[in-house]
Amino acid sequence: MYLFHLCLVFACVPCPTFQASKLCLGWLWGMDIDPYKEFGSSYQLLNFLPLDFFPDLNALVDTATALYEEELTGREHCSPHHTAIRQALVCWDELTKLIAWMSSNITSEQVRTIIVNHVNDTWGLKVRQSLWFHLSCLTFGQHTVQEFLVSFGVWIRTPAPYRPPNAPILSTLPEHTVIRRRGGARASRSPRRRTPSPRRRRSQSPRRRRSQSPSANC
């Protein structure tokens, strides 16, 4: 898998998986690559969130599968967020296989526990952050997630006596509603708002009676 990503990076192929390939290789080599820069965010902003803020990996994987299984398993490029979710799931699957192989070949239970805890605290946390970020961008909108991260970063760095008691909450609804059409296609449209039509003002002057024509009296 890493050979595939390595070829993409060295060949500078302009494809949607280019950034995700640099992400996977960055984790492998320890390079200072921030995969959130192209989305207007950063590792630093995500690290302001506490560790227990991010849901469990199984819950995130189940959510991604339930909402976007068709897009993730298809061959079409839907968005950079879908591509990042794909690569995060692939990286975590490879790490899970590595842990399973180590568990079956290492006899010491203490060593196995240390390895599993280390993977969960390092790579596992990065996958949790990545899945949460991109799922939230697809659910609430990228701009809303950016504002939330900045607001939370300001709140957590402000001394307790000078900040509100409650932290910001990511609760804003998305700007565009995604509607699934027949045949699997999706269309996004903004919610319509009905504006009341102005009522016609009735004239205050008395109504004039129509004068009958002379021919009507004949």
From Swiss-Prot:
Phosphorylated. Cleaved by host furin. Residues 180-218 are annotated as: Disordered. Residues 190-218 form a propeptide. Keywords: Disulfide bond, Host nucleus, Host-virus interaction, Repeat, Secreted, Signal, Viral immunoevasion. Residues 1-19 form the signal peptide. May regulate immune response to the intracellular capsid in acting as a T-cell tolerogen, by having an immunoregulatory effect which prevents destruction of infected cells by cytotoxic T-cells. This immune regulation may predispose to chronicity during perinatal infections and prevent severe liver injury during adult infections. This is External core antigen.
